[in-house]
């Protein structure tokens, strides 16, 4: 589909069909993107003799990984909606300035993060709960991954600009190409070359590098609507700051995910040791099977809402939201049921250690008890972003994790005898409370936002 027909589709195509056309590739891309981490952990968990310790050590790198992702999405999730709104106003020149400024800030963040995390990886992993047994595996994985973080930032930060132009399939191919390469290289580097966790990290970095090249070639080519141009690489405060202001909510969500991961691993290390931390490593991967497809659905809905909001098409904004809302809630409802029925099957994917599988299955049922409500929160919070409501989106991004979940992780063990159970129970309580508050806030403000336009 060419750029003109993409623009016409945003204005005229039936919303359910348009959302499906944009969201399905985005969901597939998110699931495939998840394979970067899941495939690593599956292979690492099955390294003979050291699988459980290696898996736990690599899992302790999660907070750093999430912070790198957060920095990428600061530019991507903030810049892409701003670009879409400008496109809706037929102002592609400003949209291209947004693209160029976001690209440069991604490069600057890559340099800063590489220097910081490479130097302090051992100290940070120890702070997160690494033991003498698991620390070497975490450091080996972290340092190689960190050296390739520039590719991660380009892939995650620039890909939303492809989706927001209506090129969902091109966006999906970014992650498909990288994931396929990662799946092929992982067993070769880990087992054939006997590189262990270093091989897993190297495979991930190389696959992300290919994805970054793919994105840059597309955004510099003829098919894209918005082009990367050198003249737009000069940072402009009036262009960049509104993007970062809008993206800060996603940045906070992912950054608090990092703080949350530290809170979980440090508490579980204290109350349950390496076994509990290993279970949390698996749970983190399984939970992404819910959160990443939700993000994919919202990535499909975001350009529709943003474009039509910019164009003043209120009815299409409403239809896009309610279609997205329904898709998110149906998905999380189904996921909740599957988790309650088959937790052991999911745990067994990541390890052949019977004790770890049994422990993780028990923890999964507790942790996932409120996952059905997550669709409400994500659909509403992401819709605030699509409509340019940065402050409200930021507050709601903080609500679930920073205001509710993290305090509960430390408070509940003081009131419940089984300390590990108390730590896991904090998750469903915060899920349900945050969903109720976010949904009520959105429906209270939605019509007011549309009527102000």
At which residue positions do the language-model features occur?
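Small-residue hotspots at the loop-to-helix junctions and early N-terminal turns
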Residues: 52-63, 138, 142, 201, ...
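Transmembrane helical elements of multi-pass membrane transporters/channels
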Residues: 21-40, 144, 178, 207-211, ...
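Small-residue-rich hydrophobic transmembrane alpha-helices
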Residues: 55-115, 152-171, 279-337, 341-343, ...
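Helix-terminus/linker motif at the lipid-water interface of multi-pass membrane proteins
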Residues: 31, 35-55, 125-132, 188-195, ...
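Short alpha-helical transmembrane segments in multi-pass integral membrane proteins
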Residues: 1-23, 83-150, 194-247, 305-370, ...
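N-terminal transmembrane alpha-helices
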Residues: 11-50, 63-78, 82, 107-114, ...
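Transmembrane alpha-helix boundary and packing residues in multipass membrane permease domains
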Residues: 26, 30, 42, 81, ...
């Amino acid at each position: 589909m060419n750029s003109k027909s993409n623009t016409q589709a945003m204005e005229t195509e039936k919303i359910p069909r348009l959302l499906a056309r944009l969201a399905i590739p985005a969901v597939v891309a998110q699931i495939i993107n998840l394979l970067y981490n899941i495939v690593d952990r599956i292979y690492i968990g099955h390294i003979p003799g050291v699988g459980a310790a290696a898996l736990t050590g690599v899992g302790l790198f999660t907070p750093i990984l999430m912070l790198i992702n957060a920095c990428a999405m600061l530019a991507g999730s903030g810049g892409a909606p701003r670009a879409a709104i400008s496109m809706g106003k037929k102002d592609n020149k400003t949209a291209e300035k947004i693209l160029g400024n976001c690209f440069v800030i991604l490069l600057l963040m890559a340099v800063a993060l590489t220097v910081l995390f490479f130097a302090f990886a051992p100290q940070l992993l120890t702070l997160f709960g690494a033991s003498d047994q698991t620390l070497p595996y975490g450091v080996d994985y972290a340092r190689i991954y960190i050296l390739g973080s520039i590719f991660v930032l380009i892939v995650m930060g620039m890909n939303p600009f492809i989706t927001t132009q209506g090129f969902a399939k091109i966006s999906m191919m970014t992650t498909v190409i990288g994931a396929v390469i990662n799946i092929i290289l992982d067993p070769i580097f880990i087992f054939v070359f006997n590189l262990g966790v270093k091989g897993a990290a190297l495979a991930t970095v190389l696959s992300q590098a290919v994805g970054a090249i793919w994105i840059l070639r597309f955004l510099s080519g003829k098919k894209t609507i918005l082009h990367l141009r050198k003249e737009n690489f000069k940072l402009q405060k009036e262009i960049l700051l509104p993007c970062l202001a809008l993206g800060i909510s996603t940045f906070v969500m992912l950054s608090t995910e990092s703080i949350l991961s530290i809170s979980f691993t440090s508490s579980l290390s204290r109350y349950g040791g390496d076994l509990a931390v290993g279970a949390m490593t698996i749970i983190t991967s399984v939970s992404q099977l819910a959160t990443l497809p939700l993000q994919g659905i919202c990535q499909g809905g975001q350009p529709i809402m943003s474009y039509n909001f910019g164009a003043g098409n209120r009815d299409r904004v409403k239809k896009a939201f309610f279609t997205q809302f329904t898709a998110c809630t149906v998905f999380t409802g189904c996921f909740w049921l599957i988790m309650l029925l088959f937790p052991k099957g999911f745990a067994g994917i990541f390890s052949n250690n019977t004790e770890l599988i049994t422990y993780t299955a028990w923890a999964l049922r507790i942790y996932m008890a409120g996952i059905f409500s997550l669709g409400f929160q994500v659909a509403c919070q992401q819709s605030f972003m699509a409509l340019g409501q940065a402050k409200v989106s930021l507050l709601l991004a903080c609500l679930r994790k920073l205001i509710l979940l993290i305090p509960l992780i430390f408070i509940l063990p003081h009131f419940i005898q089984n300390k590990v159970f108390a730590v896991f129970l904090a998750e469903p309580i915060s899920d349900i409370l945050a969903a109720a508050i976010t949904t009520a806030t959105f429906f209270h403000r939605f019509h007011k936002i549309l009527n102000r336009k």
